[in-house]
From Swiss-Prot:
Its EC number is 2.1.2.11. It is found in: Cytoplasm. 3-methyl-2-oxobutanoate binds at D45, S46, D84, K112. This is 3-methyl-2-oxobutanoate hydroxymethyltransferase. It is an enzyme of class 2 (transferase). The active site is at E181 (proton acceptor).
Length: 264
């Protein structure tokens, strides 16, 4: 199988072809996703909640991310693999580079970091040293204590203009992908159209170039609160492989996410 690359996603944006991505944490699911053609995966610090049982992503370490990245890479050798740099792993550009090197050696193709214009120097340093960067704006879970909970971000003119400014700054610094989480559809559309790089949404409507879901949400195996933007594809199909195919098909056709999964 031909490897999926950042250039593959850039072509999807140029061709206006939506693409699906998903979180993965282990060999078996990564292998299954790849076999069904779902070839963009994220080893997210969401593993702190879904795998380790914490109530936030904050306890996750670089070693945790590297361990799961290596497992996913073994299951999906040709996927485009993103890996989160967890809380306090990129407080300075130098620290970011050291920790990015660790997860890249484990098998990641790209690192994802949360934050806006304050990360410009870090993004520049990483990209200059051959570490591709995916930005993450909107609801950034590592900032849950600042936000006072998991809340929609970017409502109102000032907040939306700031997120657009952040997105443009990250792109100018060298970021090659951007994740937008829990923002109004209207803002997601503005940002997606303003950027040349692909934008991946989660809780950002169907106007972004791609979508991502935490795999546990996509299969309905998350305990407790279910995010508004989540859809249980396994409940509709009764088969994990069929659920993966349906998720991909609904993203590519624009059926998912629907209005019921979106914010305004």
């Amino acid at each position: 199988m031909k490897p999926t690359t950042i250039a593959s996603l850039q072509k999807c944006k140029q061709d206006k072809k939506r693409f699906a991505t998903i979180t993965a944490y282990d060999y078996s699911f990564a292998k299954l996703f790849a076999e069904e053609g779902l070839n963009v995966m994220l080893v997210g610090d969401s593993l702190g909640m879904t795998v380790q049982g914490h109530d936030s992503t904050l306890p996750v370490t670089v070693a945790d991310i590297a361990y799961h990245t290596a497992a996913v890479r073994r299951g999906a050798p040709n996927c485009l693999l993103l890996a989160d740099l967890p809380f306090m792993a990129y407080a300075t550009p130098e620290q970011a580079f050291e920790n990015a090197a660790t997860v890249m050696r484990a098998g990641a193709n790209m690192v994802k970091i949360e934050g806006g214009e304050w990360l410009v120097e870090t993004v520049q340093m990483l990209t200059e040293r051959a570490v591709p960067v995916c930005g993450h704006l909107g609801l950034t879970p590592q900032s849950v204590n600042i936000f006072g909970g998991y809340k929609v971000q970017g409502r109102g003119d000032e907040a939306s203009d700031q997120l657009l400014s952040d997105a443009l700054a990250l792109e100018a610094a060298g970021a090659q992908l951007l994740v937008l989480e829990c923002v109004p559809v209207e803002l997601a559309k503005r940002i997606t159209e303003a950027l040349a790089i692909p934008v991946i949404g989660i809780g950002a409507g169907n106007v972004t170039d791609g979508q991502i879901l935490v795999m546990h949400d996509a299969f309905g195996i998350t305990g407790g609160h279910i995010p508004k933007f989540a859809k249980n594809f396994l409940a509709e199909t009764g088969d994990i492989r069929a659920a993966v195919r349906q998720y991909m098909a609904e993203v590519e056709s624009g059926v998912y996410p629907g209005e019921e999964h979106s914010f305004h």
